[in-house]
């Protein structure tokens, strides 16, 4: 049982927590709903409800590059401090919230060395994860830096993954599931000791509906018109 679920069970009058979710940041400040400003709103809401949120920063341009407006990019690393501060402040406000936030960056991003060597003291409430593929073997300096940081406990390492259609899917906080941006991993519990075998399918379906709709209020509007998910909408 995750800590945030256990915390809710101890005080079920609070909103049930989302367990884990993913956000892929687009390379813009505010011209796209999934830009940096959108990621701050998304992370804030997730952390307020005790969620774990993985923020993938690899689409951001490298530090020092210019955009079409002549603005100089900050790169992905400086924004990690904002996400760390979000987690720190939201944990302290009111009732303690057992949220978590992880910043992800691909190993082939030009700023990866800054990412893995970033001063931990500046991002105490944030974890880091490096997304790698077999090509990392061809960059021994990067590989050594990543492995050294992993040995010190400064970063985690996860493989890049793609779905059956060749589309990128992204690791969540615990690295137990791969999701697309804004997708969510939900946790609930079914007591198999009191369920007849014939009732198991219904138990899981009812459990998911109860979890997604009745408790979290995070039911996605996109699901209302889809034909591929559990809801059969």
Predicted regions and their residues:
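Extended catalytic cores of very large enzyme megasubunits
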Residues: 1-233
